[in-house]
Amino acid sequence: LIDEGVTALDALALPADESGLARWYEQIEEVFAGSWAEIEGRLDAAGEFGAKVRELTAQASPSALVAAAELFHANATQDLAGSLDNERVLGELMRGEPDFAEGVRAVLVDKDQAPSFAPQPSPEKYREVLK
């Protein structure tokens, strides 16, 4: 393999399957914009796609969902340095949230996979630290 160099990969590579996300591209573009509250509202009207997103986020921390939506919104107008700084400051804030410790407990400590997260917070607390 070493003698063949990168061309050895051609003989070993498998054809790529179609992306599982590709079929949802239009719905992703339509649904995932704005605040988490806006996204949730659009999920209700998104049929099978909305049901799948709800299934995949059922055990997610409400604060993480709200914060992620705010981060994406803020970073849409930032350059790379500003986006990375937003990631840093939001990460610092999130690691101090009770939901972070609860998620660690549920997944890594007790391994019961049954977190008891706080109710969905206001997005303002995250907007205050983002550029």
Question: What are the language-model segments listed below?
Answer:
Residues 2-131:
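C-terminal alpha-helix plus adjacent terminal tail
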